[in-house]
Amino acid sequence: STSVLSEIRKLLIKHEVIFFRDQDISHIQHKQMADFFGPLQTHPAYGTIKDFPEIQILESTAEKPTKIEEWHTDMTFRKHPPMGSILRSKVCPPSGGDTLWSSMTAAYNALSSPMKDLLKNLTAEHDFSYGFKESLAEPGGKKRLRDAVLQNPPVIHPVIRKHPESGKSVIFVNSLFTTKIIELPRNESDA
């Protein structure tokens, strides 16, 4: 119901991550819940569920392990990144298979005042092709991801963003998609 979704949204804004364990939801329910949080986006590199292009398939097997093991925020390579992501595990091994979460609000709050002052006016480049460099290097990777690279040119975002609803400051860089801090020399940006 709308009232339940409103309460979930309030909790998400407050806590930044929420978990619903052992939920058996359909693709339609998954999409309906996601719709409540804002416009849905498709990912340019992942396969999707038939008739549900907004639901991506992330699969990791012994034969084909995941390539994304770095800390990151999903789709920061977009001019308008999504508000968040909803992850639903269909098959989870008894050990491993973890998805970890970290608060960039807590990271910001832990910074000293001089560091906050340094970062507040900096911007960073986020690049799809940087995040998918391993996939692009695979045989056929450039051809397979050509359209995704063309449709997602590098974008610039503030290093420190304010959440539009909570007003909290968050660090908005990540090792997967952030290529450089624009205003710093390369050696400092890379540090």
Which functions belong to the PLM regions below?
Residues 1-191:
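Non-heme Fe(II) oxygenase catalytic core, chiefly the N-lobe of the double-stranded beta-helix
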